[in-house]
From Swiss-Prot:
Described function: Regulates transcription in association with TATA binding protein (TBP). Removes TBP from the TATA box via its C-terminal ATPase activity. Both transcription activation and repression require its ATPase activity. Part of the NCT transcriptional regulatory complex that acts as a key regulator of ergosterol biosynthesis and the azole exporter cdr1B. The NCT complex binds the promoters of genes linked to azole susceptibility, and especially represses the expression of cdr1B transporter.
Key words, A-Z: ATP-binding, DNA-binding, Helicase, Hydrolase, Nucleotide-binding, Nucleus, Repeat, Transcription, Transcription regulation
Domain Helicase ATP-binding: 1316-1489
Family: Belongs to the SNF2/RAD54 helicase family.
Compositional bias annotation for Low complexity: 699-710
UniProt keyword annotation of Nucleus present: yes
Lineage of producing organism: Eukaryota, Fungi, Dikarya, Ascomycota, Pezizomycotina
Stretch list, region Disordered: 184-216, 241-283, 295-316, 699-740
Protein's name according to its UniProt entry: TATA-binding protein-associated factor mot1
Length: 1891
């Protein structure tokens, strides 16, 4: 299944594809219906809007593929459609025939609206609690029943709703507790998200009487229990909806989980906890539970949760979706808005498709079922109406409030209404009418949210059931009445919905209610007049309604009729009412009024355009000058164009009119200058007019800067307020434009000001083109004067106006010659010395120069007479003359003058003043440079605009260098993208001019420069000679490193910005050329084709690159790179007619991929990726046929690097488009993940991470067109491989070709199949089966088989790559004998050499190593004899207990990783022991680079997981930790195989783990207290220290505490501080330090052994003699320290239990003798006990002769203890294994268990039984497999979620305290306006209803 893709899919396309695939599963497997729905249901509760929407879509598609439920289909009648239902059908008589329906069904006729509003529980965003804690303990079915029962009360239909007290006094009463005996029956636990299993056992008061508690204590207990419930309910649970009823029966589970049975009170563990072997909570008392694990019972058939329960007579007769809809209907009233939203969307989809079957039952007649269906649907309608009334959640994200719940419920109601009979629709309408009117609901005051909800419901009713509106006049009248009431409502959101309600039925209304049109239009126009609040968001909706209505002739006729009666109702009077809203505060309103005006302009008929006059023209043009939103600006220009068309049609430009008086001020405003940051130049506000036509007062133009809050550009809806007055919109409407009018560049931005000038120029160009030519001279005079204006921005605007006019008129215009004469001086002559609008920069430069001179005077004491005098007035000032301060004056001061004055200083003056002089000069130089740059930029802009105008006028001189330079400078340096785009257009026009003329002129040079500029950005086009020496590198990786290391970062960034600007301009010009010339591009501009094609052919024609290509003076290499880069840049704009030309170049690009130079491969890879994205079929065919074979070229690393780099870029360029081809790429890339080249490996790993995400979606994509049959067959083979890799159960059975002397169990055969699969595809993995499942045997099978197959292949082919090679087994010393024995037993035909023992013995064996089949050695020997083992090429390198290489810095780890082998395999039952960083080290051995570098892994996984452990971690840290664990688990999943014993061994008896607590002795307690008092302060000071000595001190203290827990004899020795004191104490007690009385663990050990029958006297009766007596149990006793074993041996066995026969295995036993001791213990039952240290006896040994395991001490590493206990609990064990852990109560040992628990949780989450193959993991989870990061660049960056809080600041800007939670930390993900617009588009909804 792909259900998780609904949540994790990165794009809507992926999520929608996942939804479609789930639907396809339903189509192919109809029996999977309820499983699929159960999987998807939890995603409806997601916090993510996109996830909920995708889940709802998936449900809709699945339900659509399910059979329609019609129990009466055999009757031969179809279910009657609601649309055909007659209003007057009387079905009352039929109803009477039926038995009464369930009382829980609500009826529309009896719905008590006043009670619901009075008593119903309000539905807000969240009730402050995410779960009903009191329901958390119920199973899903019980919870659903309870919620259904209480729903009537929550709706207010049973009086006032009072929340239940979560925990009342009765809950505190002690209940009798039945003591349970240990049992091996455990029920499988399942939960639905938000619920859990029982949380805690009944609370038992200490004194047994609840009456003994005071009221305060009872309240305290309530709070504690409430908190406990909350904690339980909020835990994250694995969602599993696959079973509903199974848990109700006490049966044996199909998969058991570790299950605790309390020995004291039978309390159950939380159902959501991990399989955990340790319990910690000290505050809850001793954990004396028994954990029963690993018992495999018979399977229990499970029914999906959502599947209706079968009855005794057969399948459930009800509608199959009834149970799911019950759950969703309860969720409709959840306190959390996201849950309500998801439920409403899902109900919408189900009802839309399957609503006709709802409520129907098998066995009823058609008539009866029709009634049942109507009643069920009526009930749902009632509930939806209740939500519309009770919901109060609104989102003020946009201009209008969006109520997502009410909107979605409205859509659900719409879907429902399409299924309802007419009678019910009328009932729904009546309820909605009452909700809107609110006249009979008993409300003290109207509630706007209720009215809003009712109006939304009415909107969808109107849209869906137009048929009833047409039939029923009363219904139409009622709707109109409600809408008119809504349009007059005090709340603007209600007005907005009311207007939107009428839009879908506008046509029907106009045709059927012509008599009321006049009234309605009056109301609509009055609604606009009465809008008082400047934030009234409804204005846009009202205008849209108005525009829609005015498209009907009937409405226009009605308006004309109104106008005849009342002149105030004419178009000329009404339309101007819209003008105030042109500059409304809210963007959507400004947009709506423009849409309305556009509609009015397009109307035809007499009198419809009488409102168009000079004032209208002026107001629209003012929009262009002050509008900051680009979308509204474009609309304004469209309205302007339509306005000019209307005026031209009327002939307004032909005669002298009042237009001229309006146009001149507009020209003045258009050419007005604007300033620079900090020095604004305001517009002349007196030239603006108000909507009334009066001039705009300049005093109101600019808002005060001191109160920015009053000038927010977009209004934000805040408190609703009702205005009693009805006046015209206030004159402050222009406040939205205050900053534009003031010219406030700091707030508005220079780009926005420039854009307004550009649009104004376009508008004036259009106006001048249509204006009567005879009236133009006066206008042109004003414009041409602007070309000589003192401000650069005025000159720019004038030139742009001329250009826009010329584009329309061409060179033939009457004024062309005049315009050209005025423009040429700008291009050819000198520019003015300075511009007035940038004079401020010169003032700053002068001030800094003056400061420099003052510094000479004050610090260097230079006489004033020697200092130059600076003019006060600067150039650009209005009164500036020829002697004003200029830029050259400034340059003289900081240059010659500075040097002259410095030379005149005495040595003493230099010493004291030189530093400050240099600093002041640097400041002045910076100011001068800034002034110079600004001046050059303004010159460039004016020249470029003038050049563009001359080109548009076709005034191209014979020597066009000045024109070309003007435009090309803009292409190179213009920072403003729109001005640069204009220059690109002008260049295109110039090239077109020359291509149509006889001479080509400078075209080739222009094209050459554009290509050069396009390739100047080294981040896109690398420098050839700079990278020419790189051969075995992948530049895609190197370039990311280069970007980070630059000595002068500021200079680098400045140069990089300049290069980006130049490339952007050149790329724009080339793209415009491609669009302009289309398929003729290469013919019209042959130089472009030559620049791309020639270098490729010249450099790549031969097999080798030209020998001199690296010569510094040779440009061919750079030309190749530039050609590829240029093709990549402009290819997306190519006409399809040019594609064959590109395809002809593909072989050369492929050849470039094989090039030995990294830089050419890089350029070719990026170019090839772009070609594939544009010309997909031909490109991908070439990829599969030519590029992919290169990736396996073992002889040439350049081929592999080129191919993998190409795939890397292809993935990122094509994104979703690569889906049909993804299967071709996975296997080749996978093979390179273990490449010998590090860079190939890294890039392959990164690419594979992205590719595998898409594999689940690939199957549903249709075959790509154009691929050959051969390729399609190849794709099927690749699919088979992927299926095997992702599901171990699909791996082909591997027949072992050699005679293994063992019968493999089925799971062992599966393991060998998996190992053979890895072998076949040269993959490497970890076999991490549970301890005792035969990893050794499986390994022997695959190694022996591979040796045999290689020998056969070599005999047949004599190929050196399959020659005989030895395999190496590396294991702990204890297991070397074990491996020898296993090999001898199972594969005696293999020649095995044990490379162990002392150096002399190993030296003797060295010559035999290359010829052996198997070499067994240890990790230490690998480290010591590295020079012996390294030179040998091994076939297999197997690391047994591979977790021993967990420390990547250990010498043994480094040595092992240097070994060379064909196949690498790790065996480990516990691959993660302490932290996840260990897993990185393991994979660094298997596939270096697969998990990134150690630092990346640490940041991405290890740190978040570790940070989430701390109790003070924030919820975001905890979430980051959980996500990191899950991501890591998925990433390593395909390369680990793990099976648990309880899964695969039916015959393995259970293992019971129990804690055995001992109270510390008096002596121990005394020593503890003394140590704590004396050492605690010192230890606290040293915690966190990085000093080695401090760390050692802490470690020694911990060791002291651990030893003391065991026996005081281990710590109290001579030299101990309390030695004498202890001796005195012992003397007084007549005891000694080794007495078991002082070490309770020893006496506890004795008691345990005796209880087990070990050490008891032999039976005195019967036929057994003492000599022949054998104990019923045999034990393994584990200690950490050999010293403790000595004490156990001497004090317990020798003194207390002398009859016990025992063996001992610790570090003092030679490695070669250890297996003998194991064999003796297993075969000789007379030995009762085996004493072991955990380090020696805890790994790999088979000790099934014992059935009792006792831990006297515990390891910090929990996996070591688990490993040790599983020495007995493994294959071959016939008895129940009891594990006892001796724990000294209240000591450090309990802390150790706490730490163990966390480590086990992490390990079991990352590596668990899902690693049995991806078949056990939903394919939905595959999306985020291998998520190393999107690119190599992001992979190197540390994750933000790593829990690092250093230097973080909180919301107030203060430095955040570590671990402290901010008040916004838990804020959920924000959703955006786009989601609302997409979801609540009425047209889209209606389309789905039809579909």
């Amino acid at each position: 299944m792909t259900s998780r893709l609904l949540e994790t899919g990165s794009t809507p396309f992926i999520r929608n594809t996942a939804a479609q695939q789930l639907a396809d599963v339903q189509k192919q497997h109809p029996d999977e219906l309820f499983n699929l729905l159960g999987r998807i249901l939890p995603y409806l509760r997601s916090k993510s809007w996109d996830t909920r929407a995708a889940a709802a879509k998936a449900i809709g598609l699945i339900v659509a593929n399910a059979d329609t439920f019609d129990p009466n289909q055999d009757d031969g009648q179809e279910i009657k459609k609601a649309e055909n239902d007659d209003l007057d059908v009387d079905i009352k008589s039929e109803e009477e025939l039926l038995s009464p329906m369930d009382d829980s069904l609500l009826q529309l006729e009896r719905l008590d609206l006043p009670s619901i509003l009075k008593y119903g529980k309000r539905l807000l965003g969240s009730a402050g609690k995410e779960y009903e804690y009191s329901l958390a303990a119920m199973d899903p079915a019980s919870r659903l029943q309870h919620q259904k029962k209480t729903l009537t009360s929550r709706l207010g239909l049973a009086g006032e709703y009072i929340e239940e007290d979560l925990i009342n006094d009765n809950d505190l009463v002690s209940k009798p507790v039945v003591k349970e005996e240990p049992s091996f029956v455990a029920s499988r636990e399942h939960s639905i998200q938000g619920t859990s299993q029982p949380l805690a056992s009944p609370i038992e008061p200490a004194n047994g009487e609840e009456s003994g508690l005071s009221k305060r204590q009872l309240n305290q207990l309530k709070r504690k229990n409430k908190q406990s419930a909350r904690m339980g309910a909020n835990k994250v649970r694995v969602v599993d909806l696959s079973s509903r009823r199974a848990s109700e029966n006490v049966t044996t589970p199909s998969v058991a989980t570790p299950y605790p049975i309390k020995s004291e009170n039978g309390e159950e563990r939380n159902g959501d906890s991990k399989p955990d072997y340790f319990s910690l909570d000290r505050s809850a008392g001793d954990d004396e539970s028994k954990i029963v694990s690993e018992f495999k019972g018979a399977s229990v058939p499970e029914n999906p949760l959502l599947q209706p329960e079968s009855t005794e007579e057969g399948p459930n007769p009800n509608w199959p979706f009834e149970l799911m809809c019950d759950i969703l209907m309860v969720d409709l009233f959840d306190p959390n808005w996201e849950i309500r939203h998801g439920a409403a969307m899902a109900l919408r989809e189900v009802i839309r498709i399957q609503g006709a079957g709802a409520g129907r039952v098998q066995g009823k007649s058609r008539a009866e079922n029709d009634i049942l269906n109507r009643k069920w649907l009526d009930d749902l309608a009632c509930r939806l109406l209740c939500v519309l009334m009770l919901d109060r959640f609104g989102d003020y994200i946009s201009d209008n409030v969006v109520a997502p719940i009410r909107e979605t419920v409205g859509q659900t109601l719409g879907a429902l209404l399409s299924q309802l009979p007419s009678r019910s629709v009328i009932s729904v309408y009546k309820c909605l009418y009452r909700i809107i009117m609110q006249t009979d609901l008993g409300l003290e005051r109207p509630i706007w949210e209720v009215c809003h909800g009712g109006m939304i419901g009415l909107r969808y009713l109107v849209a869906v059931r137009k048929d009833l509106l047409i039939k029923d006049s009363k219904l139409m009248d009622g709707v109109l009445e409600a809408v008119m009431k809504g349009l007059g409502d005090y709340d603007d959101d209600v007005r907005a919905v009311s207007a939107a309600t009428l839009v879908p039925i506008a046509e029907e209304f106009v045709k059927t209610r012509q008599s009321t049109l006049g009234t309605l239009m009056t109301i609509v126009w009055d609604c606009l007049s009465n809008l008082q609040d400047d934030l009234s968001a409804s204005t846009g909706s009202v205008m849209d309604l108005l525009a829609k209505l005015c498209t009907f002739q009937e409405v226009l006729d009605a308006m004309k009729a109104n106008a005849a009666v009342n002149p105030e109702s004419s178009f000329g009077k009404l339309v101007p009412r819209l003008y105030p809203f042109l500059r409304h505060t809210i963007t959507s309103v400004r947009s709506a009024v423009l849409r309305a005006l556009m509609t009015f302009l397009q109307l035809e008929g007499e009198g419809t355009d009488e409102w168009v006059d000079g004032k209208t023209v002026r107001l629209i043009f003012q929009n262009l000058l002050v509008e900051r939103n680009e979308g509204v600006l474009k609309q304004s220009l469209q309205v302007w164009s339509e306005l000019l068309n209307s005026l031209e049609t009327r002939g307004s430009f032909k005669s002298e009119s009042d237009l001229l008086s309006h146009i001149k001020p507009l020209i003045t405003l258009s050419m007005g200058p604007f300033g620079v940051p900090r020095y604004p130049v305001p517009m002349d506000a007196s030239l603006f007019i108000k909507p009334s036509g009066l001039p705009f007062p300049s005093s109101a133009a600019a808002p005060a800067r001191s109160s920015p809050a009053s000038n927010t550009p977009e209004g934000t809806k805040g408190r609703r307020r009702k205005s009693e007055k009805k006046e015209a919109p206030p004159p402050s409407a222009h406040n939205v434009d205050g900053h534009m009018l003031q010219g406030d560049i700091d707030l508005v931005g220079a780009d926005t000001m420039l854009r307004s000038k550009i649009y104004a120029a376009r508008a004036l160009g259009q106006l001048l083109f249509v204006w009567d030519q005879n009236q133009l001279p006066s206008l042109w005079q004003s414009i041409l004067e602007g070309l000589n204006h003192s401000a650069s921005t005025s000159q720019l605007a004038s030139a742009m106006i001329v250009e826009e006019y010329a584009k329309l008129s061409g060179p033939s215009g009457r004024y062309a010659s005049t315009l050209c004469e005025n423009l040429r001086p700008i291009i050819e002559g000198e520019r003015p010395p300075w511009y007035s609008d940038i004079a401020c920069y010169l003032h700053v430069a002068r001030a800094q120069c003056h400061s420099l001179l003052n510094t000479f005077r004050d610090h260097a004491h230079v006489p004033g007479s020697r200092l130059p005098v600076l003019a006060v007035i600067v150039q650009g000032d209005p009164e500036a003359g020829p002697n004003a301060f200029s830029l050259s004056d400034a340059e003289k001061v900081i240059g010659p003058d500075f040097e002259r004055l410095k030379k005149g200083l005495t040595p003493a003056q230099r010493i004291t003043a030189l530093q400050v002089l240099n600093d002041t000069r640097a400041t002045a130089e910076s100011a001068v440079n800034e002034a110079r740059n600004v001046r050059e930029q303004r010159d460039l802009r004016v020249r470029a605009a003038a050049a563009g105008a001359l080109v548009a006028l076709s005034d191209i001189p014979k020597k066009p260098s000045h024109i070309i330079k003007g435009m090309m400078d803009s292409i190179k340096k213009e920072e403003n993208a729109e001005l640069q785009q204009r220059s690109a257009t002008a260049i295109t026009s110039l090239v077109e001019y020359y291509t149509t003329s006889a001479k080509r002129g400078p075209v080739d040079k222009v094209i050459g420069n554009l290509v050069k500029y396009c390739c100047v950005d080294t981040s896109e086009t690398p420098e050839f000679h700079h990278n020419a020496m790189l051969e075995k590198s992948i530049l895609s990786l190197r370039k990311e490193e280069d970007r980070r290391d630059h000595p002068d970062a500021a200079k680098f960034e400045r140069e990089a910005k300049e290069a980006r600007i130049m490339r952007r301009g050149a790329k724009e010009a080339l793209e415009q050329l491609a669009v302009k010339f289309g398929s003729e591009l290469m013919a019209k501009v042959p130089n472009l084709a030559s620049l791309i094609e020639r270098p490729l052919k010249e450099a790549l024609a031969a097999d080798e690159l030209p020998a001199n290509i690296r010569d510094p003076e040779n440009e061919l290499g750079q030309e190749v790179v530039d050609g590829l880069s240029t093709l990549r840049a402009i290819l997306p704009k190519f006409h399809s007619g040019l594609y064959p030309w590109v395809v002809d170049l593909l072989p050369l690009v492929v050849k470039a991929l094989q090039c030995k130079l990294s830089v050419i491969r890089y350029a070719a890879a990026k170019c090839f990726a772009t070609i594939c994205s544009v010309i997909t079929v031909e490109g991908m065919t070439m990829l599969v046929e030519k590029v992919l074979p290169m990736i396996n070229d073992a002889l040439d690393v350049h081929h592999r690097q080129g191919a993998v780099e190409c795939i890397y870029h292809l993935i990122h360029v094509m994104e979703d488009g690569i889906l049909p081809y993804v299967i071709f790429l996975v296997v080749p890339v996978l093979g390179r993940m273990s490449d010998s080249d590090n860079e190939v490996r890294l890039l392959a790993t990164t690419s594979f991470a992205t590719l595998v995400k898409l594999v689940p979606l690939e199957a549903g994509i249709p075959d790509p067109p154009g691929l050959s049959e051969e390729l399609l067959k190849g794709r099927d083979r690749e699919r088979q491989f992927m299926a095997q890799m992702l599901d171990v159960r699909k791996v082909e059975e591997f027949k072992i070709p050699v005679a293994i002397k063992a019968e493999l169990r089925p799971y062992q055969q599966e393991g060998v199949n998996w190992l053979a699969f890895l072998n076949r595809y040269n993959l490497h993995g970890i076999l991490c089966d549970d301890m005792g499942l035969g990893k050794t045997l499986q390994t022997i099978c695959i190694v022996a088989s591979d040796h045999h197959m290689r020998a056969e292949e070599f005999a047949r082919t004599q190929k050196p790559e399959v020659r005989k090679l030895p395999s190496l087994i590396v294991c702990p010393p204890s297991l070397s004998g074990h491996w020898q024995q296993e090999l001898k037993q199972y594969a005696p035909f293999l020649n095995c050499v044990a490379y162990v023992g002392p150096p002399a013995e190993r030296s003797r064996l060295q010559s035999a190593l290359p010829n052996a089949d198997i070499v067994v050695t240890s990790y230490d020997i690998c480290r010591n004899d590295n020079e012996v083992l390294n030179p040998i090429n091994w076939n297999y390198c197997v690391l047994d207990e591979g977790h021993l290489i967990k420390n990547p810095k250990a010498k043994a780890t480094i040595a092992v990783k240097r070994l060379l082998s064909n196949h690498r395999l790790i065996l480990s039952g516990t691959p993660i022991q302490n932290n996840v960083l260990e897993l990185w080290s393991l994979f660094d051995f298997l596939m270096p680079g697969f998990l990134g570098t150690e630092k990346v892994f640490l940041d991405r996984f290890a740190k978040p997981i570790a940070a989430s452990r701390f109790s003070k971690s924030s919820s975001k840290e905890q979430e980051a930790g959980a996500l990191a664990i899950e991501a890591l688990h998925k990433q390593v999943l395909p390369f680990l195989l793990r099976r648990l014993k309880e899964e695969v061994l039916n015959d393995l008896p259970p293992k019971i783990i129990q804690n055995y607590y001992c109270d510390p002795s008096e002596l121990q307690r005394k020593l503890f207290e003394d140590f704590t008092k004396k050492e605690q302060k010192a230890l606290q000071d040293k915690v966190g220290s990085t000093e080695k000595a401090d760390k050692e001190h802490i470690f020694q203290a911990l060791q002291y505490m651990r030893r003391l827990c065991n026996s005081p004899a281990l710590v109290v020795k001579e030299g101990h501080k309390q030695y004498n004191e202890v001796q005195q104490y012992l003397a007084a007690k007549h005891s000694n330090i080794r007495d078991v009385a002082h070490a309770p663990k020893l006496s506890a050990l004795r008691d345990l052994l005796i209880d087990c029958g070990i050490g008891v006297d032999s039976p005195s009766e019967g036929d057994l003699s003492g000599a022949s007596y054998v104990s019923p149990h045999r034990a393994l006793i584990f200690c950490q320290m050999k010293e403790m074993l000595d004490i156990v041996q001497s004090e317990v066995f020798n003194k207390l239990l002398p009859s016990v026969q025992f063996l001992r295995l610790d570090g003092s036993v030679e490695a070669t003798r250890r297996q003998d001791i194991v064999n003796r213990f297993n075969t000789d039952p007379s030995y009762d006990v085996l004493l072991l240290t955990t380090s020696v006896g805890g790994l790999g040994l088979n000790l099934t002769g014992a059935d009792t395991v006792i831990f006297v001490e515990h390891d910090w590493n929990p996996q070591k203890d688990i490993q040790a206990m599983d020495r007995a609990h493994r294959i071959g064990q016939k008895k129940v294994v009891n594990v006892y852990r001796l724990i000294t109560r209240g000591t450090l040992e309990e802390k150790i268990l706490n730490l163990q628990r966390f480590k086990i949780d992490v390990a079991s989450t990352v590596v668990n039984q899902q690693n049995a193959g991806l078949g056990t993991m939903d394919t939905d989870q595959l999306l985020d497999l291998f998520n190393l990061g999107e690119t190599a660049e992001t992979a190197e960056k540390p994750s933000d979620a790593a829990g690092n809080e250093v230097d973080m600041v909180d919301i107030d800007g203060n430095v955040k305290e570590k671990g402290k939670k901010g008040w916004l930390d838990d804020l959920g993900e924000l959703w955006d306006d786009r989601q609302y617009q997409e979801e609540y588009n009425l047209d889209s909804f209606l389309a789905t209803m039809k579909g």
